[in-house]
Curated annotation (Swiss-Prot):
Pfam families: p450
Catalyzed reactions: 6-deoxoteasterone + reduced [NADPH--hemoprotein reductase] + O2 = 6alpha-hydroxyteasterone + oxidized [NADPH--hemoprotein reductase] + H2O + H(+); 6alpha-hydroxytyphasterol + reduced [NADPH--hemoprotein reductase] + O2 = teasterone + oxidized [NADPH--hemoprotein reductase] + 2 H2O + H(+); 3-dehydro-6-deoxoteasterone + reduced [NADPH--hemoprotein reductase] + O2 = 3-dehydro-6alpha-hydroxyteasterone + oxidized [NADPH--hemoprotein reductase] + H2O + H(+); 3-dehydro-6alpha-hydroxyteasterone + reduced [NADPH--hemoprotein reductase] + O2 = 3-dehydroteasterone + oxidized [NADPH--hemoprotein reductase] + 2 H2O + H(+)
Organism: Oryza sativa subsp. japonica
Gene disruption: observed consequences: Plants show a range of abnormalities in organ development and growth, with deficiency in the elongation of the stem and leaves, skotomorphogenesis, root differentiation and reproductive growth. Treatment with exogenous brassinolide (BL) rescues the abnormal phenotype.
UniProt similarity note: Belongs to the cytochrome P450 family.
Protein name: Cytochrome P450 85A1
Induction of the gene: Down-regulated by brassinolide (BL) in the brassinosteroid-deficient dwarf1 (brd1) mutant.
This protein's pathway: Plant hormone biosynthesis; brassinosteroid biosynthesis
Its membrane topology: Single-pass membrane protein
Gene: CYP85A1
Length: 469
């Protein structure tokens, strides 16, 4: 009897599941002009498969449905686009049927005023404020000297002259990126405050790509909780600065006093959301790119040899304590190529999201109002027509022609949403590489696993043995 009852329950579950899946497909298929695809379960869609399978999920659907298909991921019906020209047009069409369409989890955790989400006059004001903080003149006169001093000091402890040391380069670059961001943005040095901020920021990052289910134990719940704590810490920091009247040479002070060259002064809420977004975006991109650059250089000795030569040439005529300057950075052509190739091959950013404000025609299909477009840049990064032999680490490809001006160059986004921190991020990674390759030699230790979806990471760390050069 028990076995019969179990069999009935299982059969009923199968029937109900099949009916739910079928009902969901029929519900969406009534909309005319949709691209082919599947929508998965009601409410959850295909999010679980998307997050678990990642690139395999995308490739399987591309083979079945073509380069434009529909799905339901991260809480919203979505059209995935893998065609370079269609993606370029989508990114360039803000205000003409498209607005930013990031998942609810990211909007909630980074804040409703985060620069990736706001539109219109507020976006112009916040982007203007951010560009004023990271414009070339600021990098040259203020940010680069700070970055240089930080990197020199931070990397000094990675090894000793008497012996080699095994380090987890993933953990090291995460700490480095976060401390560098905190130092530049809010003047926070290593200590109890940075430790408290670090703990919450690590939790916040995990919640940004998740289903917005606010239940204890979920990444979203933990991430949103971490945001509340971060907001409280930043509010206290702002209050203390106002009461002390002391001047601080950092981005937070510039935002509080009003950034030079901007018309509008941001509210405290907007400043806090901008600070959280700055730290989040700088931390994620810089730490991952730095880690993967070390990995790729370790695997490609010829590239490492040319990179070292470039940096030792810069050190010629400098005393050991001399900093690198703007002219040194501008001369790092191969370093820039290594950074761009790392971003491309590792696919640090998998894609960009837009949302339709009206029915939009795309490639003969009609994308309904309120749907998302997932500009899937991973496939563009691996397009053999744009990047011959795309799965090979080849930084020299970036020296052959000005790839940065190519209309399908999307390593830093596109359209009016091109990453405003592109250059300062490149400066940070280049400065890290300068001191790392001129001070150390290294080799990979053990068998390290690298995952590239939904974010690039080494689940058990990426261990290298470091020795003084």
């Amino acid at each position: 009897m028990v076995l019969v009852a179990i069999g009935v329950v299982v059969a009923a579950a199968v029937v109900v599941s099949s009916l739910l899946l079928r009902w969901n497909e029929v519900r969406y298929s009534r909309k005319r002009g949709l691209p082919p695809g599947t929508m998965g379960w009601p409410l959850f869609g295909e999010t679980t498969e998307f997050l678990k399978q990642g690139p395999s999920f995308m490739k399987a659907r591309r083979l079945r449905y073509g380069s434009v298909f529909r799905t339901h991921i991260l809480g919203c019906p979505t059209v995935v686009c893998m065609e370079a020209e269609l993606n370029r047009r989508a990114l360039a069409s803000e205000g003409r049927g498209f607005v930013p369409g990031y998942p609810q989890s990211m909007l909630d955790i980074l804040g409703r005023n985060n620069i990736a989400a706001v539109q219109g006059p507020l976006h112009r004001a916040m982007r203007g404020a951010m560009l004023s903080l990271v414009r070339p003149a600021m990098i040259r006169s203020s940010l680069l000297p700070k970055i240089d001093a930080f990197m020199r000091s931070h990397l000094a402890a990675w090894s000793s002259s008497s012996s080699s040391a095994v380090v987890d380069i993933q953990a090291k670059t995460k700490e480095m990126a976060l401390l560098s961001a905190l130092r530049q943005i809010a003047g926070v040095s290593a200590g109890p405050l940075s430790d408290a901020l670090k703990a919450e920021l690590y939790t916040l990052v995990l919640g940004t790509i998740s289903l917005p289910i606010n239940l204890p134990g979920t990444n979203y719940y933990q991430g949103f909780k971490a945001r509340k704590k971060l907001v409280a810490m930043l509010e206290q920091m702002i209050a203390e600065r106002r009461s002390s009247g002391q001047v601080h040479d950092d981005m937070l002070d510039a935002l509080l006093t009003g950034v030079e060259g901007t018309r509008e002064k941001l509210t405290d809420e907007q400043i806090i959301d901008l600070i959280i977004t700055l730290i989040y975006s700088g931390y994620e991109t810089m730490s991952t790119t730095s880690m993967m650059a070390v990995k790729y250089l370790s695997d490609h000795p010829k590239a490492l040899e040319q990179l070292r030569k470039e940096h030792f040439d810069i050190r010629k005529g400098k005393a050991p304590e001399d900093a690198i300057d703007w002219n040194d950075f501008k001369s790092m052509t191969f370093t820039r190529a290594v950074i761009f190739e790392t971003l491309r091959l590792a696919t640090v950013v998998n894609g960009l999201l837009r949302k339709t404000t009206q029915d939009v025609e795309m490639n003969g299909y009609v994308i309904p109002k309120g749907w998302r477009i997932y500009v899937y840049t991973r496939e563009i990064n691996y397009d053999p027509f744009l990047y011959p032999d795309p799965m090979t680490f080849n930084p020299w490809r970036w020296l052959e022609k000005n790839m940065e001006s190519h209309p399908h160059f999307m390593l830093f986004g596109g359209g009016s949403r091109m990453c405003p921190g592109k250059e300062v991020g490149t400066v940070e990674i280049a400065t890290f590489l300068h001191y790392f390759v001129t001070q150390y030699r290294w080799e990979e230790e053990g068998n390290n696993t690298i995952l590239k979806f939904p974010r690039v990471e080494a689940p058990n760390g990426l261990h290298i043995r470091v020795q003084d050069y």
